[in-house]
Amino acid sequence: MLMDEGMPMSYHEHMGTIIQSEEDVDRFMDMTNKNTFLLYDTGHLMFAEANYERVLKNYISRINHVHCKDIRKDVFLKSIKDDLSFRESFLNGVFTVPGDGCIDYRPLIKILFEEKYQEWLIIEAEQDPKKANPLEYAIIGYNYLSTALKENDYTL
């Protein structure tokens, strides 16, 4: 129905929801048809300790939106050690933009390129603007992703 109107349905896997882990994503994708897409979020998948590269490879044909978000590894490891909730981790600054965290986007960009991905790709940080200047971090993310995209012959 939505597809007939040119509006594909995408589900955003996200911590704190019913679809957050790799297993949740697998089950969701198995229970839905090819007209239901996945909004692929690197930061939330890594936070869920998912194999985010495997998820991308397995579902690339049903991904129509990518949130490029990164994780501050030290904050993430402290969150695990201290058994913090997702909300507490978020408030402590676990998320950042690509190029400022620990996710290597080069293999992910390579998969997107090999599969001729031409859909949405956005930079997302989910961080406190009082602690991390949005423009400054947008530039960090843009520069990092631009380099990774150009290495795979994507044009911006």
Regions found by a protein language model. Name each.
Residues 22-29, 53-56, 105-110, 138-146:
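Generic structural signal for well-ordered alpha-helices
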Residues 69-71, 100, 106, 110-114:
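Catalytic-face loop-and-helix region of soluble metabolic enzyme cores
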Residues 65, 119-120:
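Residues at the N-termini of beta-strands
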Residues 122-126:
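Short acidic/histidine-rich active-site segments
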Residues 1-98, 156:
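Acidic/histidine-rich catalytic cores of soluble enzymes
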Residues 132-155:
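C-terminal helical cap(s) of enzyme catalytic domains, especially alpha/beta-barrels
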Residues 75-76, 129-132:
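Short active-site-adjacent structural elements
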Residues 1-9, 107-118, 148-155:
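A structural motif corresponding to the C-terminal end of an alpha-helix
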